[in-house]
Amino acid sequence: MRRLALLIVCAVMPFLAQAGETVPNTLDEAFAALDQLLPPEDRHAFKMATEEKAITRGHMAIGLYIRNEWFRSGKSKLSGKLREAGARSLDDASSMVLTSYWRHLNSKPINLKEQGECYTKWWTEQQRLEKEARAKGENGYGTPTFSCP
């Protein structure tokens, strides 16, 4: 697992220094960019993993690249579109891109609205747990018992 993440990070690093890099503004553009960024063997490994494993493994590798280079740079309109769909954080947004990419590679319905609704539900539950813990005078609180997607 860690080897795949490391391979993906190493494969992507040369692209970080490219000047004038075009960032995607749509999911289709993101898919095309990921097709270019990921070597065929990494793309194949991502596709062949289960959806959950692919997203988990990719989160701190290609997901980190997506967050830093596409979203934090402010150059891409895609993060705003994902926020409109329900992403509440850049982690949510990059996970939605990775989930959508995995589904695209595997010819599955992307269901972006459903993905966004899950994140909205997750954050609502997180806020409820925080409020409940504060009301009890507790310093800590749990996280929702489900993950997205």
Mark where each language-model region is:
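Positively charged n-region of N-terminal signal peptides that target proteins for export
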Residues: 1-4
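Compact alpha-helical subdomains of small soluble proteins
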Residues: 45, 49-146
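Hydrophobic h-region of N-terminal signal peptides that target proteins for export
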Residues: 10-18
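Sec-dependent signal peptide cleavage junction
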Residues: 20-24, 28, 138-149
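Small-side-chain structural scaffolding
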Residues: 17-19, 30, 63, 94
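N-terminal secretory signal peptides
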Residues: 19-57
